[in-house]
Amino acid sequence: MCNHHPQHSHDNDTIRIRGARTHNLKNIDLDIPRHKLVVVTGLSGSGKSSLAFDTLYAEGQRRYVESLSAYARQFLQMMDKPDVDLIEGLSPAISIEQKSTSHNPRSTVGTVTEIHDYLRLLYARVGTPYCPEHKLPLSSQTVSQMVDAVLKLPEDTRVMILAPTVRERKGEFVDFFADLQAQGFARVRVDGEVYQLDEVPKLEKNIKHNIDVVIDRVKVKADIKQRLAESFETALRHGNERALAMEMDSGEEHWFSARFACPVCSYSLPELEPRLFSFNNPMGSCPTCDGLGNTNFFDPEKVVAHPELSLATGAIDGWDKRNQFYFQMIQSLARHYGFDVQAAWETLPEKVKKVVLHGSGKEVIDFTYLSERGTTFNRSHAFEGIIPNLERRYRETDSETVREKLREYQNHRACPSCGGARLRKEARYVYVSGEPLHEVSAWPLTKTHQFFETLDLDGNKKQIAEKILKEITERLGFLINVGLDYLNLSRSAETLSGGEAQRIRLASQIGSGLTGVMYVLDEPSIGLHQRDNDRLLATLKRLRDLGNSVIVVEHDEDAIREADFVVDMGPGAGEHGGNVLIADTPENVAQCENSVTGQYLSGKKSIAVPSERTPVNPDRMLVLKGARGNNLKNVTLELPLGLITCITGVSGSGKSTLINDTLAKITARELNRAQEEPAPFDDIHGLEHLDKVINVDQSPIGRTPRSNPATYTGLFTPIRELFAGVPLSRERGYNVGRFSFNVKGGRCEACQGDGVIKVEMHFLPDVYVPCEVCHGKRYNRETLEIQYKGKNISQVLDMTVEEAREFFDAVPTVSRKLQTLMDVGLGYIRLGQSATTLSGGEAQRVKLALELSKRDTGRTLYILDEPTTGLHFADIALLLEVIGRLKGKGNSIVIIEHNLDVIKTADWIVDLGPEGGDGGGRIIAKGSPEQVAKVKGSYTGKYLKVVLR
């Protein structure tokens, strides 16, 4: 062991841990310096998360929460109390994990980071509202301001002062004119023409008119101030607080209002307040879409599911021969419009398609219906149309099942009223420096940041906005510093990847400016390109410099080298881990012989660059043309089959859109018959070389404690068959079901096969206590009497994969699957370990193992999204071996990855970029790693050059 003896100090600069035994920790003692950047590293499963999250964070949070009242505690999720003798020097803890943010469609990047709240405040305090129709600013002027505005015109300009009295109203207005004459007025302007009051022509009764009373006619001179003031006062009195000054020679009009309103149409707003700009408040949200920005509609492309078929044979589900009532309507339409119900839908004239889908309008059609009794009856009415029919049924039904069914024909589109802005009309026409809020929110963060940095307001507006602007620009700056410059504030939070969501939380934490806190982060570098790594590390150091302890579980080499202190866990994983190998500075860790991390840091061990690359076979290519989802710019992707291809590029360059949203969904639809809707593309060639596609992601293998590696990989069934075949089982008549803990029979009924009983504690975390009847064994006594090679079913579930591999050596169906779990480096997990306790990286490798154990055709396309998440250098070497085996059988592997060790070993690279967001979405480079390293504009190439030397 390398030196890591805890000092016996009682200073305030150390977090002292004594006797930590959480999960697989082996009673460890450890001192960690406070207010430093500490990286916890080690193999996958070596106990990093157990130390950082389940011990340090859990205890820090628990102590803080316990200081609250019992009433407040019941609303907080309490962590389990870690199994540890003593922890001293803890601060209140905040964890920033990789869970995706909320699944609430109302959450956006702006609301999650609270920038939107500051923007609402800014627009409410210094925004200028405009009239949506006349595009004039709403403003109120005093009489003296109106006079000054007229006096600013060139001297001797002839001006007519008018009072706008009638706007867009029908009528003859005879009495109105008589009334004006009685009040002593001489002239009026009717529909733009000026008349003497006694010469006004007779007005058309059914046409809308505009009438202004002429109050005064003046030439602009300095000495007419008093006269103008009196004229304006009269005009305001008669013109409903509005007045109009018209230059008589040019006809140009200057509108004035004494009320806060549009001088032309009197459109006015109550006082601007922040909630007018909130799409989550009825006062601000667009009434059509309720502030969601999009509406559901019945999509003709989904309604006509099979355009190649005829209406009679099922072009439109539910309207073909099998549905007599609806099909009779179609036949009557065919008679009326003269088309053939047996003709393919795509060959029908556009007019016919329009009538069938959207109805006949006012045109009446003769319908003939045949009742079930065989009687014929006729009806004449307009045809509703299939889409209006679906809309009506969707509105009127009370059945959730019918709604679910109808939803299959729906799609989203931007809301027709607000165009996706989410806000009501009034809020969309309030401007700051000429820009409305929804436009600013749709820009990439770099542009938004620049706009507010250079925003120049005048007078007291500047003073009001100063503090708000400081908050906005700072927070935007933090988001840009964690590599999220390509996002925009209106981006929905549910579309963010785990890494993006985590970095947004990180930026929000810096924005909150807390000090004296212990932050625990889980691999913040996930999904980040090497280029943005330095900015992320600078952000972490900034958190530390505010006076916080920053503890990061991380495998990234740069992060380990930049840390103030490194804790290396190991030596193995699971049972073989849980010890601290060394806790010291990065330099000393690199010197440590026993530490695998140290060996990789010092260069004693490394992942080798392959000596030769597998050549590309031009006859076996998968070509995807014209991909244009999200920010992709009409991309054509060429994938050589039978090789390992890495898709690289900075965050937000379009990798996930191209692979997960386009390629994976097209191939799943064509090869696996999945109901997937890919992002827009033109064409795909080369699918004949493949027979299935498998997307191996990091989602959990099961969400309940009953799901475990044995059930997921299908190991458990042959194991139960072995137990059912034991002579004693046969004698008692036990079958395979007897050995399942999910059904009655063999399981312990007291805990229903869970092995633990949940006790609700209300103010404290729920406690799981071992079942008193079976003592956590999950089965009843009779079942446990059955033994195979001296072990019962519960003891088998408690074995690690490694132990089970030896135990079942003679049973090929079982040992083959166990061997693949060993191959992906999961020898340490227990067969019955609850799926909920597996990390994302472990879950992904269980899936890989399952794929490896299947019989193989060698024509599979595997898609992996950042498989190195949660993996140490040594684990990556193992993963590359497994992927190499898949390739060896002739399969094709596509990996989205930022890790240079994986990228340098690929046969082919497709690099997207050059930037994220709008600045990305193009293929910058493609070819072998050596070829990509030579491409000037490629960031990936720049970093590859260094590792390929």
Curated annotation (Swiss-Prot):
Residues 319-596, 616-945 form the ABC transporter domain. CDD domains: ABC_UvrA_I, ABC_UvrA_II. GO terms for biological process: nucleotide-excision repair; SOS response. Signal peptide: none annotated. InterPro entries: ABC_transporter-like_ATP-bd, ABC_transporter-like_CS, ATP_grasp_subdomain_1, P-loop_NTPase, UvrA, UvrA_DNA-bd, UvrA_inter. GO terms for cellular component: cytoplasm; excinuclease repair complex. PANTHER family: UVRABC SYSTEM PROTEIN A (PTHR43152:SF3). This is UvrABC system protein A.
